[in-house]
Amino acid sequence: MSHSACPKPATARHSQALTGEIRIPGDKSISHRSFMFGGLASGKTRITGLLEGEDVINTGRAMQAMGARIRKEGDVWIINGVGNGCLLQPEAPLDFGNAGTGARLTMGLVGTYDMKTSFIGDASLSKRPMGRVLNPLREMGVQVEAAEGDRMPLTLIGPRTANPIAYRVPMASAQVKSAVLLAGLNTPGVTTVIEPVMTRDHTEKMLQGFGADLTVETDKDGVRHIRIVGQGKLTGQTIDVPGDPSSTAFPLVAALLVEGSDVTIRNVLMNPTRTGLILTLQEMGADIEIIDPRLAGGEDVADLRVKASKLKGVVVPPERAPSMIDEYPVLAIAASFAEGETVMDGLDELRVKESDRLAAVARGLEANGVDCTEGEMSLTVRGRPGGKGLGGGTVGTHLDHRIAMSFLVMGLASEKPVTVDDSTMIATSFPEFMGMMAGLGAKIAESGAE
């Protein structure tokens, strides 16, 4: 399904208080991995709360193409997995659409199989660098035929038997770490990932839950050493996917910015590797109450009650970036309404997301009257409390769902409306966004649907 075929602009207007209670769709990271590990494990995996966005569904289709049986009964997804080491060579290229996570993790998963697997994606995914995942796979004996710059479309030709490696991850990337660990599942011996900066750890937690022989040690310098023993048995599990903190960010920031708002968000994943945004907003003065913190399936979960707040600018520590990398666009929106200056640094990973997300945010802010400075790896925003004089612009989304949702949130609190040039790709991560926001009282309409 091509997003570029028929763009749907949307406009958000100044709204009255947002009120109500919502439950956010399932976490995208955990949903991708649930399909992958369920498809790989022996026996049956049952999943509730799965995020049914296009990206995750594409991962499910890829697992089906390699032998997993996946069906939905009511609200439950049921997977009959093939067993570790038993994936089949797909007959056609695996199409991941817009899904960088699905593509990169699956490259790791299948790379060490003695078979040939081809990967394709949409225009946005085909621009994104895959070398970061392909380089460790090459060390394990995988041959790669790729478009220029290690981009898709690409084909992996696996070795007869893969070599286990010890790999030091050169950037803070959960996808690279995960790809190497998944490659280790079908590799004899011990595969080790050395991670200097901790990133989201869903792969480690979930693989242990499925029965993989995986250990994590942190040395005296805080460097994590993750070891996986290959060719072990994985067994199907029951998974209830908690709400995605990256999707939670949009209604959460909207509730902070729209005067008089009071919104409760249920069942949000509070894994410490994912809560950088909440911490930062609290430092800015946000009224966010964490209710009933609990454990579900080995993950921290809580409900959040969010009330409209007067925010002040802060300096965000660069080392916090891995725990909120997807939330900077909507943080920049919050900063636009804060008193004073907000400085965000260490944002180099944003340059290689669905779009050059840093540039896209800066252009969008400028188009809507925000005083901001874009650096090589940084963004500084000087806010206007109350959103006075903000809005009135149209934002280029560059096929990026998070840019689209962030600027629609902006329009709810700015003086003048904000338009995004396309809203179709919101369906990749948060298909319910428009309806859920409208239910809270947000004025968002697709253009032509006024």
UniProtKB/Swiss-Prot annotation:
- Identify the Pfam families for this entry: EPSP_synthase (PF00275)
Indicate the principal place this protein occupies in or around the cell.
Answer: cytoplasm
- What are the BP-aspect GO terms? amino acid biosynthetic process; aromatic amino acid family biosynthetic process; chorismate biosynthetic process
- Keywords for the protein's UniProt record, in alphabetical order: Amino-acid biosynthesis, Aromatic amino acid biosynthesis, Cytoplasm, Transferase
Q: Which SUPFAM superfamilies match?
A: EPT/RTPC-like
The record's disulfide annotation reads: none
Q: What's the protein name?
A: 3-phosphoshikimate 1-carboxyvinyltransferase
Lineage runs:
Bacteria, Pseudomonadati, Pseudomonadota, Alphaproteobacteria, Hyphomicrobiales
